[in-house]
Amino acid sequence: MKMYRQGDVLIVEAKRGRPMRGQVKPAADNVLVYGEATGHAHRIEGDAVIMDTAEGKTIEAARPFRVVHDEHDTIEIPEGFYRVVRQREYDEEQIRYVAD
């Protein structure tokens, strides 16, 4: 299983056809995650399709694509099917997303 990380976003290779709960719909834009601190966004460049599901976002790409962010190096990801994970900080008192 391949994984790619850009700041607080983890992109994990997934199996196609994995059953998903609830409604699956195309995302409204090319943004994976909006940054909390600066407002910059982790976004896709290329022909990849982002889908919103009850479990989070997925990416399906027939060709390599790029993930870009104003404060991180651009990463190139090969074609495939991926799950998008927003990484969280661990604290015994509370769970919160990693500040990017």
Residue ranges and their predicted role:
Residues 1-68:
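Long, low-hydrophobicity ectodomains and other hydrophilic envelope-associated domains
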Residues 55-100:
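Short, compact, well-ordered microdomains
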